[in-house]
């Protein structure tokens, strides 16, 4: 399994994994990750491992039934945190972020710089054009300089799509 970590900022949070269906789009600029809404069980399971017969009671004393809740699997597994932007603050953030990614590319993959500049400018323009369709997620450390994943729903779909800048991630094999 490969986990993709942020290369910008101080935290280098884990942001996504190839455990989820992912494809490259926009000339290899973006990873599109298919997420799903899943139900997680919030009940506390207490099993001391002693006498199994005595553990099978009708009602566990002292443990409330917490129920379950719906979550997005990528958000839950990668511990992503929803954040918010208005158009102006996102524009400021993305300019600074692109500058950092370009600096990393210039050092590590200079042949990719020109394509990144062109494709990233086109992509950001399209995001700003549909700005209200997106939600924004940071890694668990909420690094303000780090990668912000975009989430949206395709028309008629119930499961969300996450978008990540491929050049802003480092792949780590586990």
From Swiss-Prot:
GO molecular function: calcium ion binding
Cellular component aspect of the GO annotation: cytoplasm; nucleus
Localization (cell): Cytoplasm
Annotated protein name in UniProt: Translationally-controlled tumor protein homolog 1
UniProt KW keywords: Calcium, Cytoplasm
Family of the protein in this entry: Belongs to the TCTP family.
Predominant localisation class: cytoplasm
PROSITE patterns registered for this protein in UniProt: TCTP_2, TCTP_3
Matches recorded under SUPFAM superfamilies: Mss4-like (SSF51316)
One GO term of the biological process aspect: sorocarp development
Superkingdom, taxonomy of origin: Eukaryota
Domain TCTP: 1-174
Free-text function comment from the UniProt entry: Involved in calcium binding and microtubule stabilization.
């Amino acid at each position: 399994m490969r986990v993709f970590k942020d290369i910008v900022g101080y935290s280098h949070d884990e942001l996504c994994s190839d455990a989820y269906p992912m494809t490259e789009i926009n000339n290899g600029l973006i990873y599109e990750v298919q997420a799903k809404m899943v139900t997680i069980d919030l009940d506390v399971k207490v099993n001391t491992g002693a006498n199994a017969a005595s553990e099978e009671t009708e009602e566990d004393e002292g443990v409330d039934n917490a129920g379950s809740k719906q979550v997005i699997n990528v958000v839950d597994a990668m511990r992503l945190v929803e954040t918010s932007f208005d158009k102006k603050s996102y524009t400021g953030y993305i300019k600074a972020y692109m500058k950092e990614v370009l600096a990393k590319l210039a050092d590590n993959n200079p042949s990719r710089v020109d394509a990144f500049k062109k494709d990233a400018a086109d992509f950001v323009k399209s995001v700003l054009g549909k700005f209200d369709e997106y939600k924004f997620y940071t890694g668990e450390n909420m690094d303000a300089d780090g990668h912000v994943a975009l989430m949206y729903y395709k028309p008629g779909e119930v499961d969300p799509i996450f978008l990540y800048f491929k050049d802003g991630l480092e792949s780590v094999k586990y």
